[in-house]
Structures are given as structure tokens and as C-alpha cells.
Amino acid sequence: MRLSKIKIKNYRLLIDAELEVDSKTTLIVGRNNTAKTCLFECIGKVLDGTPFSFNDYPLSKRENLYANITSFMAKEITFEELYERLEPISIEFLVDYALDDPEDNLGALSPFIIDVDVDTTTALIRTEYKLKADEKSVWKILEPSYYENGNFTPADDVHNAIISNFNKLFEITIYAINPKNPEETQIKKHKELAELFPFHIIQAERRLGEDGTHDNSLSS
């Protein structure tokens, strides 16, 4: 089996990015500012279980975030509407196991294969960092910044309440998806995803030259 495609949405500058992974690919290179680091940071956070921060949420989506949370706190929209309107940070992994023997034990991939059709040879996994489906919890966190003595009076620093509580308002959910029927999903554990994709980042070592300047080449 092999990882054949990665899709990332709403992570920093990666609003809607897709990477096709060739079967012979062992190294990804590219020019500066082409989002290589951003790509692997996103993957690393998901696989390590590191929560996303507010800084990871795209600048272009923040006004929508602020406006809809304010509308919810003002009781202009329902929590269900808020939940649907806030776009999550998401990453999809498409795994191809077409070359594996049907009788083989697919091991760590097995929990993510939910279509029992023998003609299906791909597994689709999506992780979403989205608003918690807990209206009371969200309201309790934000209420002090939007209400005073029972009156809707948003504080001047109301945005800071969202920023500082981002990890309390949002959570990660991992789905196994039927590639032939995207409406059919199962929620999976982070441990299952981590076992499927062992992931380790080796940081580039930057050496300081004798003249005090940085040598940006990788050390051997």
C-alpha cells in the first residue's frame, strides 16, 4: 500500500491544496516559499496530536470566524448554523492498496477500510480541526466576553477571547470515509492514525560560519 494523495484545506496559506504522491517519490524538493514546510508542519501536527493554534487558521477566513461567532452570541443564528458556517482546518490522506494481495493482512490500514467491496482498492482518511459540537461549552467560554449583566455588550478585546481559547473551542476528529460513498463515515482514534503513518521530522541544521554568517546548506 502507498500514500497516493494529500489534500489540505484552511491551514495558513494552504486554502485548498492537493499533492499527488508518485509511487517512486522518496524526496520532495521545491523553491522557497512554495509551502513545503507548511505542508509537513500540518501533517506533523495531525499525526503527533499537536493542537492547531489560532495562527494556523487562514487570515482570509478569520473575519468569517469572528462575524459568525458574534452572530451566534447575539442569538441571531443557531449553534447548528454556526457549526456549519465555520470552515475547519482539514487534511485528507488517500491510500492505494491496489497492488496488495487481497488475502494479505493490511495491518494498520484495516480500521480505515470501511467499504467491503473487493473492487475497492483505496482508503480515504480525513482529519478535521473544527468547532466542538458542544453548544453549552462554547457558550460558557465566550459568554464573559460578549455579555455584561445579562446584556449583549461585546468587549473591545472580544477577538482575543477567541484567539486565546481557540484550543478549547475547536477539536480534532478523524474519519474513515467510504471512497465510493463520502456520506458513509466512521470516527477513528488518533492512535490508529499514528500507527498507520509513523512520522518523524528531522530538522535542517544551520551552521554558523567563521565570519558570523549563517550557512543555509544542510550539514552532512
Predicted regions and their residues:
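Pre-Walker A-like glycine/lysine-rich segment at the N-terminus of P-loop NTPase domains
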Residues: 1-49, 54-69
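Glycine-rich phosphate-binding loops of NTPases
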Residues: 58-88, 92-220
